[in-house]
Every structure is written in structure tokens, then in C-alpha cells.
Amino acid sequence: MRRIFVVLPVSTEKWIKETKECVSKVISGATEVHVTNLPGAPTSIETYYDSAKAASLVVDAIVKAEMEGYNAAVIGCFEDPGLHASRELVSMPVLGIGETSIVIASILGKRIAIISTGRNSRAVYERKMIEMGLYRKLAYSCGMELPVL
């Protein structure tokens, strides 16, 4: 049986049930999926500081998950805190929903747009597109002044 570890890099338990329900609709019955939050993390990821604060907790959780026999990990936040550091430390695949979404959108469309919460998110995702070498595909990016919670 395959085992996938999904880490929500926030302290709130608000999205655990919803994430489990979404995953159960698309995952094979032969795959076990464990979804968890991170006590001690920010309640939401809305700033660079929030992301930085959550990153080491994400990395620690993913390293532990690999030791517990998980075959892959998913970081359930578009900001992908701790993604690259996790990949340095484990041998299993680690996906961030932000990076993965951008790659898939870039494959499916000639240009993409990113609309997110938080007035500073435009700069965050433009930087992410530059780092990924996909900035030329970005047609539009904006951050709306909406809190995550």
C-alpha cells in the first residue's frame, strides 16, 4: 500500500476534514493518505514571515513522515513553505501545491494568471514564477485584500 503524507503548514485544524474529503475523491483505494496540521505554526500563511515560521516545522514533519514509511509528501499551501529544504533531506517525492499548480497550468495554457488572497501575494507569486523560469508565461497576477481565515 502506498502512503502519502499531506501537511497543512498551519496550526488551525479548519482544513483537515475538507482536505481529506477532496483527496478521497481522487485517490486510489490502495493508497493511504494522512492529512495533518502543525501545532506551533501560524494560523494561516499570509506573509513571508508566516511562511518562514512554518517552513522548519514542515521540513521536520516531512522528515519524520519518511522515517515512518510514507512514500510521498504534499505541502498543502500555495506558498509551498519548506518545499526545497524538504527535498534536500528526504528521498521520497515532495510536492507543493503552489509549484505543482503553476507547472500544470503552464503545460495546459499558453499564459496563466494567479489571483490570490493578501495584498502582498502578487510579489510572492511573481517571484515564484521567476524562480521556476516561467515568468514569461505569467499573464496576470494580483493579490486581493482578503484574509485567509
Named regions from a protein language model:
Residues 6-7, 67-77:
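Periplasmic-binding protein-like
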Residues 36-56, 149:
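N-terminal beta-loop-helix "entrance" segment that forms/cooperates
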Residues 52-69:
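Short, well-structured alpha-helical segments in soluble
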